[in-house]
From Swiss-Prot:
Family: Belongs to the phosphohexose mutase family.
Taxonomic lineage of the native organism: Eukaryota, Viridiplantae, Streptophyta, Embryophyta, Tracheophyta
Catalytic residues (UniProt): S181 (phosphoserine intermediate)
Enzyme class (EC, first level): isomerase
Descriptive protein name: Phosphoglucomutase, chloroplastic
Tissues in which the UniProt entry reports expression: Expressed in flowers, siliques and germinating seeds.
Length: 623
């Protein structure tokens, strides 16, 4: 094999010629590391292997017997504060100097040696702009730090749920997920990276805090001098004791779904001529999964998958499955002769939106309905769920299911890691968040396709004895039957995206001042206060405490108003207001949620003085 060496006086791990812009249509850039006077192996514009003719076959390519490791000097870079959703910034930030390389090395500096030395790690992402280049950077630094094996999805593709599934199935020590979730992608937009542990769940704060601390003191990056890996073909490449296996991104995840659900039952529903199905992959990662699962295995029509090709910029769209950003799907579902069931997933495949014909299912209702029907409709839960949980802002619909089924119930802060602890302790089976995240203990991430298959299972179970020509039990029928049994929790969320951080934070501080003066019995218009607080949670598994998780006003009739700032964007702050009102009267269940909630919405805007603090007249998104 011919090696190419280049000497740089000052070079960067991801460098660009001054003033030049990278196009995915141009040759891939070489990868180097910031240092001075050090020879660094780079890969020019060519494949270094000609290995596999068929992507479905597997091959082993041997490199050198050993690899050379370089210790390259670097300096701390500001702005690498890491949360459980990882690190998210504009992609241009990650492409500067050693920004990504510093964070990856800081991660290895934060992990116990046994968690990565000679270990197996998984690598994949949602296919957004910069993922392929970042994959090469991560692989070389992993090899430089003594990792034994990297399992990487073909073309760098692995949905977040699939990463969790692969980690668990292959008993890997952890995995990197390259994604900014539902945030836009492309040269001008967002990129992100996070690390999941051996259970498949996001790294805890003890690790993310260490990562941030190490980014402030980092002085060197350990990098292996190996060529770029060909990610376009399934196969194994070895360099000494280090190997990279490019894996099919779908197979392990599909196998898990076949274990969880009755595919024959679902296939029977999707094969009916009187049942219409539509899935919008939003040009995001689930496009790689939709055809193999829904079409090839479950018999859905090929044209039932829309926006099914993953694109680096998500087709110039915003891959957030809600009524605003999934408008194409919504328009189809609200036609007179629209499909019976529609769903969408987000950038990295962990969120979902469910629709019936002219009917939207709120995420809060969705998880409650799945839980109420799981034992009958889903083989994985045949023995019954172990427990149920929701994030604090999510409506109380799930609480009532837990009460009726006599199941343990948990209310946790926003963040999937809180569910993971309960799952690992055997206390939790089904959980969800109002932010279109639903899942179970089959993995340790929320799972968009799992939620779609759960709903298809419920509909298939309800319609298994429905004869051709008879009316099918619809999505709306299932939801309204649930409301009649448990009552309806009217729920809405107002998102004000990319607000000035200063004004948004001042608004939250103002609300906390109100909390300090509030007491039970205070009157807010037609509502009487039961209590007001800043939500705090003590984990029943490890005793850890999460405080300041959302300002909430809870009234005596069960109504709630909640205020939170979201940190999942790459710029500014997103103010979220959650409004909920319980209605037991069946005759009032068909009222539009925005009408039913208007008095509470007006109260929330008045109490918070949102317009004064943020200058915003209207929300960016209403859910």
């Amino acid at each position: 094999m011919t090696s190419t060496y280049t000497r740089f006086d000052t070079v960067f791990l991801f460098s660009r010629f001054a003033g030049a812009k990278y196009s995915p249509l141009l040759p891939s850039p070489s990868f180097t590391l910031s240092t001075s006077g050090i020879h660094i192996r780079t890969k020019p514009n060519s494949r270094f292997h000609s290995i596999i003719a068929s992507s479905s076959s597997s091959s082993v390519v041997a490199g050198t017997d050993s690899i050379e490791i370089k210790s390259l000097p670097t300096k701390p870079i500001e702005g690498q504060k890491t949360g459980t959703s990882g690190l998210r910034k504009k992609v241009k930030v990650f492409m500067e100097d050693n920004y990504l390389a510093n964070w990856i090395q800081a991660l290895f500096n934060s992990l116990p040696l046994e968690d990565y030395k000679n270990a197996t790690l998984v690598l994949g992402g949602d296919g957004r702009y910069f993922n392929k280049e970042a994959s090469q950077i991560i692989i070389k630094i992993a090899a430089g730090n003594g990792v034994g094996q990297i399992l990487v999805g073909k073309e760098g593709i692995l949905s977040t749920p699939a990463v969790s599934a692969v980690i668990r199935k292959r008993k890997a020590n952890g995995g990197f997920i390259m994604s900014a979730s539902h945030n836009p992608g492309g040269p001008e937009y967002d990129w992100g990276i996070k690390f999941n542990y051996s259970s498949g769940q996001p790294a805890p704060e003890t690790i993310t805090d260490k990562i941030y601390g190490n980014t402030l003191s980092i002085s060197e990056i350990k990098v292996a001098e190996i060529p770029d890996i060909d990610l376009s073909q399934v196969g194994v490449t070895k360099y000494g004791n280090f190997s990279v296996e490019v894996i099919d991104p779908v197979s392990d995840y599909l196998e898990l779904m076949e274990d969880v659900f009755d595919f024959d039952l679902i296939r029977g529903l999707l094969s009916r001529s009187d049942f219409g199905f539509m899935f919008d992959a939003m040009h995001a990662v689930t496009g790689a999964y939709a055809k193999p699962i829904f079409v090839d295995n479950l018999g859905a029509k090929p044209d039932s998958i829309s926006n099914g090709v993953p694109l680096e910029d998500f087709g110039h769209g915003h891959p957030d499955p809600n009524l605003t950003y999934a408008k194409d799907l919504v328009d189809v579902m609200y036609r007179d002769n629209g499909p019976d069931f529609g769903a969408a997933s987000d950038g990295d495949g962990d969120r979902n939106m469910v629709l019936g014909n002219k009917f939207f299912v709120t995420p809060s209702d969705s998880v409650a309905i799945i839980a109420a029907n799981a034992q009958e409709a889903i083989p994985y839960f045949r023995a019954g769920p172990k427990g149920l949980a929701r994030s604090m802002p999510t409506s109380g619909a799930l609480d009532r299911v837990a009460e009726k089924l006599k199941l343990p119930f948990f209310e946790v802060p926003t963040g999937w890691k809180f569910f993971g602890n309960l799952m690992d302790a055997g206390k939790l089976s089904i959980c969800g968040e109002e932010s279109f995240g639903t899942g179970s203990d089959h993995i340790r991430e929320k799972d968009g396709i799992w939620a779609v298959l759960a709903w298809l299972s419920i509909l298939a179970h309800r319609n298994k004895d429905t004869k051709p020509g008879d009316k099918l039990v619809s999505v709306a029928d299932v939801v309204k039957e649930y409301w009649a049994t448990y009552g309806r929790n009217f729920f809405s969320r107002y998102d004000y995206e990319e607000c000035e951080s200063e004004g948004a934070n001042k608004m939250i501080e103002y609300l906390r001042e109100i909390l300090s003066k509030s007491k039970a019995g205070d009157v807010y218009g037609n509502y009487v206060l039961q209590f007001a607080d800043d939500f705090s949670y003590t984990d029943p598994v490890d005793g850890s405490v999460a405080s300041k998780q959302g300002v909430r006003f809870v009234f005596t009739d069960g109504s709630r108003i909640i205020f939170r700032l979201s940190g999942t964007g790459s710029a500014g702050a997103t103010v979220r207001i959650y409004i909920e009102q319980f209605e037991p009267d069946v005759s009032k269940h068909d009222v539009d949620a925005q009408i039913a909630l208007k008095p509470l919405i007006d109260l929330a805007l008045s109490v918070s003085k949102l317009k004064d603090f943020t200058g915003r007249e209207k929300p960016t998104v209403i859910t």
